[in-house]
Amino acid sequence: FSAVRPMIKESLEAAGLTVQYDEKASSDVYSTIDGNVDAFDIVIAPGDPSVFGDDADLLLRWWYAGDTWTNSRMHWKGQDSYNQVQDLLEKAQQATGQAQKDLWHQTFDVISENVPLYPIFHRKTPTAYDGETLVDFKPIAVTGLSFVGVGSTK
């Protein structure tokens, strides 16, 4: 985080905000802000559920459906945009193919226009392997490697 702190500060100040950092451990941050609407103006915190995969429904629900973030931390639950996102998530869960993707895109649009929680970094997960020595190895879309059913020529 320290490497990007100046860039975040500069961007927020360019938007007209006065920035004062009060850096804390995650557990301290959450115990301070949970349920206290006046505890902060902006919180920048790490979190990356993409380690569980790239399923759009899982990732959207992680942040925007459960009470921990929507009610205790963002104080967004119950607002019209919250209800709209929940409706879109339910419709997307029932849909398939392009119709499902279109509903997820609509959900992201509502989130980006209304919700006070939005990612500022997006992770890329590289995987490197030697295809000559690992038989039947396939990269996976999450952090880590899976060697189930894989053999080696060495």
Residue ranges and their predicted role:
Residues 2-6, 24, 75-83, 95-102:
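Soluble non-cytosolic domains of exported or imported proteins
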Residues 6, 10, 38, 42-46, ...:
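Feature representing long, continuous alpha-helical segments
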Residues 12, 33, 92, 100, ...:
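Hydrophobic, well-ordered secondary-structure elements that form the walls
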Residues 15-68, 103:
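Periplasmic binding protein-like
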